[in-house]
């Protein structure tokens, strides 16, 4: 027998190298075979419910790292709630209608207008479902636990029917109406867009300063006066029908030197404008309030048949321009709102493709709107006072990445103004994480206009509206309920397969159709109405779910997207929000803080991460970042996370190895019988348990990450395990000292494995497979540990905190001795602590082997007054370090005066000799193979 065989060296097959890319799919297959999702639901049946409603990702293309952040975050919450005693069914969903799928088919050569519509829509459907399957596999590869066999998809007939029922309820309350208001118009998509489909980019535009000649000054301005206006969209001058001034703003009539014209500009902008216009000097002729100029008539710059009325508007400011806004009601929301008060013509001079229409005039007809600035400049002639290029934020179609325009076209709207205050009241009742989300959503709802819900596309849910012979729109509850039932049985495809009369209730009549003839709407619904009614199609429709949901979790862009649309529809129909709480997350940027894009080559694919590092590394990254703000990720960052993971894994591996001979049923030592340092570690660990449980409750994953890393690296690796191994290796296998520490090891191992399962499910499942004494087949079926408190715990923590300070001081003294070549490693040291009475009292109260804790072979405690001048001194304590006296025990590696060669060929100290002689009589009788001496 060899001497080292008398040591209790930990043994385990748990590998140091994780091999996650290969092992994770195996665990996922095992979970699926065991149907763990269903088992967890059955286990928690009848317990308090928690419902997180999944915001549906768009079913197109591979998932990106933003999807991963979102789905992993949800999975962490679902898993932590499930293991904390809640019934948490989680139904994943997909958004499957909309323009992007049409665009994909177009790129594949599919020509929609040359096909039978039903065939085209079936192609859209099949493509969408193929993307659902692809993304489902991607999400499952990330370890996301969900009801994957029963997801919701917005193209499902039942979902479409429930969506129609939401529309019908809103229509029944009078919230759906048709109007020709200006809407965001995408010429590249040939469709109206909702606010949520807009993104902003900075662009350069040519802005023009020009003047309208006064035609009727109403006795205030004479006809030789010109009102100066500014525009950043020259094409809209073709539809300008008014000039808006601020009612309380001051305007001056000035005559530049050498000019026979006089001009009206805002007083607050005159100096800057004079410089732009080259007015070296000017004479001020009069001053007027904006309200005094109301109803003055001016001439259109080139169309003599058009008069432009001076009107009043509160949206006019002195931030830029001239303080006078040219007003084209067909091309802007403010223009429309103020223009309709004065009954100005709502002229639209750009068609659906962005081309100037015939009513713009022969010089413009057929030209692309963004290319007509030179024509406008030419038409203005000497009325043009200045032009300049400005850089400003401009709206773009989020899908095509092309600029859009405001354009008044007949559209269907969902009113927001009719019940805006009700929505705002519901926001006040909702909990937000982070808290600033409340203000953000509140302001968006407060300031938003009505919602344009119609789209001039094919792939989507049809608007269930019919028209009588006299043009009356029909969307009564009877009709929409009937359409909903048809969709539920046949899918929305039936809308395109049947004539209007066959889609209406049998025997339906309407006074507007004396001949019984009807037509149907050909527009479809905004896809945000699809997902925005999911509270009805999912949470309210499934028996195992509930409405309102406990939580909606999405990116911060969804304040103007899904959070917004869901809130509007839910309050409109039922008077309350669809959620009790909202958690929003920032965007995922690259390692330099830049937006990810194919052109930059900085996109991180979750699939690539899973192949290189494993999904658990990506999951640990999610837990490591502050998602309240934008977060950064790169392969380098993931490499750093992987290194942290390695430290956690290897520490837990040490615990597995050193509890391999520990049976909790027979070997556990009661807390009261633990050693002082073991009690301290138990208390510290239970504080960690409390921190983690609280952080899960608050969805604060970063706190969990930091707390676990600190506990593993500082409390365990750098302190407790650093000296505990000398006990568990050296002491007799069944000794009280060893079993005490193993009790703490095992308690930490089992509980931290459970606590980390929501974040690292593959790794903890692997660890769990080595914990043969635990009853649950899978750790996911276990319950989260509760934090315990202990008597005198605060006093214990205070005492050990003081010791940690002393330990740091002692380590400094040992380091100085090491540098002076007095010792090599700390076990070569004889440390003398010169202590004040207070420090002596502390060391006595700790009731511990201080030499063991400081990892020195010999320790002496002396009076502080006896400290030599060269001692390493601190307040109340000083240290000297000498080389320990004696020989190195081959078994304990400590220097001990009692170390000597024994009769059984072992060069060991008395303590090790006693252990050997009591526990290895055969070796004592036969002698060890080699002594090393």
From Swiss-Prot:
CDD domains: Anticodon_Ia_Ile_BEm (cd07960), IleRS_core (cd00818). Keywords: Aminoacyl-tRNA synthetase, ATP-binding, Cytoplasm, Ligase, Nucleotide-binding, Protein biosynthesis. It comes from the Bacteria. It catalyses: tRNA(Ile) + L-isoleucine + ATP = L-isoleucyl-tRNA(Ile) + AMP + diphosphate. ATP binds at residue 598. GO terms for biological process: isoleucyl-tRNA aminoacylation. Monomer. This is Isoleucine--tRNA ligase.
